[in-house]
């Protein structure tokens, strides 16, 4: 594994640790497990999109390329800006 790959996976680990810690701290506020899981997955996806967009670590910013078409799906947009429109989360 090269240094850039280590940085990538370390950042994913930070995201995972944050999501676990946050969800454990708020677990009692949820009436349904589905709502808790919805928020955990939303947070993780949002933070991964932030990482791709270059907002979580100054050393990381990526283009997401569809290798079949060659199109860059994050061309001229920030992926994390679209999470709220497409993904579910609660107000807890």
What residue spans do the PLM features occupy?
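N-terminal low-complexity, intrinsically disordered segments
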Residues: 1-32, 54, 58-66
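Short, flexible helical or helix-coil boundary motifs
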Residues: 19-23, 40, 44, 56, ...
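Mature extracytoplasmic domains of secretory-pathway proteins
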Residues: 26-47
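Amphipathic alpha-helical binding modules
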Residues: 53-92
